[in-house]
UniProtKB/Swiss-Prot annotation:
Disulfide bonds: none annotated. It comes from Erwinia tasmaniensis (strain DSM 17950 / CFBP 7177 / CIP 109463 / NCPPB 4357 / Et1/99). Gene3D superfamilies: Ribosomal protein L31. One of its GO terms (molecular function) is structural constituent of ribosome. HAMAP family: Ribosomal_bL31_2. This is Large ribosomal subunit protein bL31B. Belongs to the bacterial ribosomal protein bL31 family. Type B subfamily. The gene is rpmE2.
Amino acid sequence: MKSDIHPAYRQVAFHDTTADAYFIVGSTIKTDRTVQYEGKELPYVPLDVSSASHVYYTGKQKDFAKEGSAARFNQRFGSFLGAMKK
């Protein structure tokens, strides 16, 4: 086997900046940034979305049948379209 071809596997601090939550996960991602977390200096990767802030996991998702563009269209023009069918 060839030596020195595998990426370094180490603990990395992923930071969800939206929810201000940290996840410590083993990863091979390359980053030059570091952060002090629980007394350890770890490689740092900022995230925009994770399970801490994604609407599917937080339960704050919108019901598109009630709040979507189709519902707004039906609210504006539904009576007009219903009258034309008669």
